[in-house]
A protein has these predicted regions:
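Nucleotide 5′-phosphate-binding alpha/beta core
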Residues: 1-98, 104-233, 244
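Intrinsic disorder/low-complexity segments
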Residues: 237-241
Length: 244
């Protein structure tokens, strides 16, 4: 089934008008966005620490809130693991993304529902605007499946939160009707072992009409190598074997 109905074009036209206003005055948009986030977090432990409720400008925010790094934020975020809510953002972050970072070993960064909604909106904007500007190619793009290569969607419970790879957390939240176009599917995405998961993804992808591919470049290369190796073996079977 095609993903190219009139509603996609209508959404793209609407968002293009909105984004045009952003492009005309990006500094003003960023300023309003910062102050909106500050107001939202004003009643958290972090917001009270720096009196977010009284901040009215970017300059005031810069003067009052010191530049932070992971080491300075870690004690605050660790409180979420113990079930404390309203620490650096309203409520309790359901998930934490595990990342090795570049220094100091593993790091755990909160992932909120608002963050995932923002990522989903960006993805929708990307596809819709592409469809609006290149309708000829978009019909082919939306006529196949979207293959995402990321971490496992099986998360680990750590206290009051769940921990996993950021891409796995996002993939696990893909909802209907997008699931019908999402590959490799929930069954394979939930496999924890990397070698088994990438092998199963390659097997399934080789049989699908993949028109959209997303993932970490190094992981994408591994997948494509597996698909190519499978194709070579299929065309040149070992002596004594038959093609399936």
């Amino acid at each position: 089934m095609s993903l190219y109905p009139a509603i996609v074009r209508a959404y793209a036209a609407f968002r293009e008008l909105q984004l045009a206003r952003v492009h005309r005055d990006p500094m003003s948009v960023q300023r309003r966005t910062l102050l909106r986030l500050v107001r939202r977090a004003a009643d958290t432990a972090w917001g009270r620490q720096f009196d977010y409720a009284s901040i009215r400008s970017v300059a005031e925010f810069q003067r009052r809130v010191p530049i932070q790094n992971y080491a300075s934020m870690k004690p605050w975020w660790r409180r979420n693991f113990d079930g404390e809510a309203d620490i650096t953002w309203p409520g309790l972050p359901p998930w934490f993304a595990a990342t090795s970072g570049t220094t100091s070993g593993d790091k755990y960064v909160p992932v909120t529902r608002e963050l995932l909604r923002s990522h989903a909106r960006v993805s929708a904007d990307l596809l819709a605007l592409y469809a609006r500007r290149r309708p000829d190619r978009a019909r082919r793009l939306f006529g196949g499946v979207f293959l995402g290569i990321g971490g496992t969607t099986t998360l680990e419970r750590r206290g009051a939160v769940q921990v996993g790879d950021a891409s796995g957390i996002a993939a696990g939240r893909v909802c209907w009707p997008l699931t019908r176009w999402y590959s490799p599917g929930r069954d394979i995405a939930a496999i924890v072992d990397w070698e088994e998961r990438i092998g199963r993804i390659a097997e399934r992808a080789a049989k699908q009409n993949v028109t959209f591919l997303a993932g970490i470049p190094s992981w994408v290369k591994v997948l494509l190598d597996r698909v190519l190796c499978g194709a070579v073996r299929s065309r040149n079977p070992e002596p004594g074997t038959r093609n399936p």
